Amino acid sequence: MGGAGCKEVKEEKRSSGGEDSLSSADRIRRFIIKQFGYNVLSLARRGLKDVPEELWELLELEKLNLSLNSLKVLPPHLARLSNLVVLNLWGNQLSSLPSEIGQLRRLRVLFVYRNRLTEVPEELGACTQLEVLSLANNQLSSLPASLSNLTRLRKLNLSHNHMAHIPGCVYNMKALVFLHLACNHLENLAENIQALVELKILIVEGNSLHSLPKALCCLTRLELLNLDFNDIKDVPQSHILRSQFVS
């Protein structure tokens, strides 16, 4: 009877010793799941004020969710996660993104909405595989010209920022099908809008638009144009003829 008890104690010690021998990175690694063929890790809603240092050792990560925490800074170590395809940072307190984000050359989806960004690093333009980018609910008044390189971008959300005009780089994003600019400070839409030939959804509600450019009629793929809560007094006759896409 006593021998059996002694054996149990030894087993317990061996078990706990194995746990202690794991590196911190390995402990986090156990939370990685395989989802649709991707290595996915979610640390959402963990009350994180800083990213655990060990996270930057998980080079195999392809999808990382750090949303709904209290992160104020992302360190340059982000560049180590060069296999990232999806990075979710929404609902934090980030005032900037590290320039090293430009080294994530495989990145296709980036969510940074509901943060405190006042600018976007030029280096983001190096992430030329990006297809979805949400920068909504920040404090942005412009975007760097380097984002003209995001020619594969299909969905761009810039709503709830401080944009007085559509950033020039947007007109080079020829693959855009969805452009959300609601609740900014836009007073007009430039004729350059006609460059976005693939655009299907354009949302500009809640701005200060007074008129519409004739160039909008060149967007033959447009299915939804939301102009609610503006001050539009001048609508070209050509728009009336295509009023089926106006919301």
Listing of model-derived features with the role each one plays in the protein:
Residues 1-214, 223-224, 229-247:
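The feature captures the LRR N-terminal capping module
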